[in-house]
From Swiss-Prot:
It comes from Edwardsiella ictaluri (strain 93-146). GO terms for molecular function: carbohydrate derivative binding; carbon-oxygen lyase activity; ether hydrolase activity. Its EC number is 4.2.1.126. The keyword Ligase does not apply. The gene is murQ. This is N-acetylmuramic acid 6-phosphate etherase. The active site is at E85 (proton donor), E116. Induction: Induced by MurNAc 6-phosphate that releases the repressor MurR from the DNA. Repressed by MurR in the absence of MurNAc 6-phosphate.
């Protein structure tokens, strides 16, 4: 079956870059930068829809559900990137945020021929994850018509999972399969059809919003501090200390002692410092308030 590329926004020629091959290096960069500046306003226009998606994800987390990104090529890699950052940043359990890419692990580093054209493969991948109605599936495809992503959304809808479609083409085939439709219209690319550029930038920004805002809504952030950060390297050990110092308004020695007594749990250490409770008492208080620091402290 042939595709009508002319009908797709992401495949149209951009008149602003029609002679880009004749420009100086600096002028090429100025043009790319000018086109990139259109991405944030495009996202601003769909913030209400992004908010709906965030609320759906945080609700899924509250019922022990998962956020699952599905995509092919750049779109799949961006989902994996966002998912992989959640455990160290927010202390999420393995498997709470998952990135699935057409072609599997080999496709992370290089293109896998025809992988994106197989909708059944998406169903198989989601079945292996035991997808359920508790989960949220975000299908990512700049074109809005990638068969693998369409297959993922179709299967997800069939099992009752919440479906979110992220595309840069209006009226895409993904739309009827989505409970929530995210369509940042960034316009034609500087290099025709290279949707890793503006469309990919929009995807990255929106995925940042989805996961970060959902984690904030789930109590993973206090003020603007990542209070569930895991100390997996020297930099993050130091970050934990600084977080407890700032949130607890205490000196370094107090923060270090609280972290040691709480087995390096930032939230517990913060509540200990601010309330005077023991580690066991602070942890129990946090558990009563589903890990949210503010209501835990209010109870004191």
């Amino acid at each position: 079956m042939s595709l009508n590329l002319d009908a797709m926004m992401t495949e149209r020629r951009n008149p602003a870059s029609a002679a880009i091959d004749t420009l100086s290096t600096l002028d090429i960069l100025n043009l790319i930068n000018a086109e990139d500046s259109k991405v944030a306003p495009a996202i601003a226009r769909i913030l209400p829809q992004i908010a709906q998606a965030v609320d759906a994800v945080s609700a899924a987390f509250a019922r022990q559900g998962r956020l699952i990104y599905c995509g092919a090529g750049t779109s799949g890699r961006l989902g994996i990137l966002d998912a992989s950052e959640c455990p160290p940043t927010f202390g999420t359990p393995a498997g709470q945020v998952i990135g699935v890419i057409a072609g599997g692990e080999p496709a992370i580093l290089q293109a896998v021929e025809n992988a994106e054209d197989n909708p059944q493969a998406a169903q198989d991948d989601l079945q292996r994850l035991a997808l359920s109605s508790r989960d949220v599936v975000v299908g990512i495809a700049a074109s809005g018509r990638t068969p693998y992503v369409l297959g993922a959304l179709r299967y997800a809808r069939g099992v009752g999972a919440t479906t979110v479609a992220l595309s840069s083409n209006p009226d895409s085939p993904m739309a009827p399969l989505a409970d929530i439709l995210l369509t940042p219209i960034v316009g034609p690319e500087v290099i025709t059809g290279s949707s890793r550029m503006k469309a990919g930038t929009a995807q990255k920004m929106i995925l940042n919003m989805l996961s970060s805002a959902a984690m904030i809504r789930s109590g993973k952030v206090y003020g603007n501090l990542m209070v569930d950060v895991e100390a997996t390297n020297a930099k993050l050990v130091e970050r934990q200390i600084r977080i407890v110092m700032e949130a607890g308004e205490c000196d370094r020695a107090t923060a270090v002692e609280a972290l040691e007594r709480s087995q390096r749990q930032c939230k517990t250490a913060i509540v200990m410092v601010l309330s005077g409770l023991s580690a066991t008492e602070a942890q129990a208080l946090l558990e009563r308030h589903r890990g949210f620091i503010r209501p835990a402290l209010d109870e004191r």
